[in-house]
Amino acid sequence: MKFTLLGFGLSNKEIFKYLVKNGHEVFVSEGKKLASSDKKLLLENGVQFEENGHTEKALECDIILVSPGVHFENEIIKEAKRRSIEIDTEISFCQREFEKIGWTPFVIAVTGSVGKSTTVSLIYHLLNKKVRALLAGNIGIPIAKLLNDNLRANYLVLEISSFQLFWSKRFKPNISSILNIYPNHLNWHPDMEHYVSSKFKIASFQSKDDVFVYNPNDEYIRKNLYKVSAKKVPFRFDFSIEKLPIHLRYRQTVENVAAAKTILETMGYEFKWEFLEDFEKLPHRMEYVTEINGVKFFNDSKATNAIAVIRAIENFDDKLHLIMAGIGKNEDYTLLAKIIKEKVKILALVGPIADEIEPYLDGVRYFKVDTINQAVNQLFSMASRGDVIMLSPGGASFDAFKNFEERGEYFKQLVMQLKEGNCEEC
């Protein structure tokens, strides 16, 4: 069988290794320039490829496996559909491959606009108190890596994005969950209906024997429950924020824990609050960095949309200084601007997002700079003892960084460098 890999990102690289190892013919078509290391890998394996665009050569195959970020209006995809060429992506392709090798783990799949990585990490952590589980998906561990590394367990926890779901052919988890739905990725999805439909694809192929665990407080989810055939179980918000360990005591974590707790109990396992004590919080999500002369610094680089920034701001009073940065996602910033006006002392804007949000900032005290470094230094010079300076960008990182992790690490390095030169109480 001949495969075309449309896009050569993290997931398709792992699929490439799997396909070559199993003797399949592969062609790689990358819309951007391939890294020299990727070219070397392809040449060493005798695999033909093209870069800086897709040609009709990509159509000379039986199946096209699409990298999640490839746009749905891609001309090669349109032509492939006209020619009835099969189109799939990692999550459903790998699930079929699991079945072929006789591995049928109990699959828990989670999607949502914010909080996915924290929630799947919590589920993975809680399950491993009782059984052995694996974690993969959009959290940064390609599902195909489980095939390549021969990793097996009875339970598989997956973080799934709207892009992955859009391209998936037939993905059927035992338990699916949608945490929340807010306007997001509208620079990729043409409208909210398209985005919501992609999210609900997580439950499209579930039967009445499967389970759909959902947030009952989310209007988009409630309005679309009729699409779900699986047994519907709402999150159980039967606890207060004070129940959470100190290191997890943030408002957005309540939703994450409610989802994980409900899923664990739905599976028949006991949940104990003590299980959360040794859960290591993921970096770049409301991550406390340090304190300098009474000013606290938080790194929330993972906040790449408006609602994530709103949730971060809600954890503080009116002594907050906020840094927003990166590339916006074609969002309506009305609500975010209202919250900023109420709770943020000074807003620093860095990069392209400034032009998107500026029309909403009437009455907000803000300034624009070219770099996060300038924002940190300027805000620190204006901050008073008891204030907080937080990076919660609200935009993608690709204008200046490889990913949100690199951006967060850079911010932390800037803060620690600032501490070395300014700390009066160290």
Curated annotation (Swiss-Prot):
Positions of transmembrane segments: none
Tell me where on the tree of life, at the top rank, the source sits.
Bacteria
Q: Does the record's keyword annotation contain Cell division?
A: yes
Q: Would the keyword Transport be found if you checked this record's keyword annotation?
A: no
A Pfam family per the record: Mur_ligase_M
Q: In which pathway does it act?
A: Cell wall biogenesis; peptidoglycan biosynthesis
In this chain, ATP is annotated as bound at: G112, S113, V114, G115, K116, S117, T118
Name the principal localization, coarsely classed.
Answer: cytoplasm
Q: Which reaction does this enzyme catalyse, per its entry? A: UDP-N-acetyl-alpha-D-muramoyl-L-alanine + D-glutamate + ATP = UDP-N-acetyl-alpha-D-muramoyl-L-alanyl-D-glutamate + ADP + phosphate + H(+)
Q: Its Enzyme Commission number?
A: 6.3.2.9
Cell location: Cytoplasm
One of its GO biological process terms is: peptidoglycan biosynthetic process
Q: Which SUPFAM superfamilies match?
A: MurCD N-terminal domain, MurD-like peptide ligases, catalytic domain, MurD-like peptide ligases, peptide-binding domain
Q: Please provide, in alphabetical order, the Gene Ontology terms of the cellular component aspect for this entry.
A: cytoplasm
User: Mind listing the GO molecular function terms for this protein?
Assistant: ATP binding; UDP-N-acetylmuramoylalanine-D-glutamate ligase activity
The record's keywords, sorted A to Z, are: ATP-binding, Cell cycle, Cell division, Cell shape, Cell wall biogenesis/degradation, Cytoplasm, Ligase, Nucleotide-binding, Peptidoglycan synthesis
Q: What does this protein do?
A: Cell wall formation. Catalyzes the addition of glutamate to the nucleotide precursor UDP-N-acetylmuramoyl-L-alanine (UMA).
Q: Which family does it belong to?
A: Belongs to the MurCDEF family.
What is the protein's name according to its record? UDP-N-acetylmuramoylalanine--D-glutamate ligase
Organism for this UniProt entry: Thermosipho melanesiensis (strain DSM 12029 / CIP 104789 / BI429)
The UniProt gene name for this protein comes to: murD
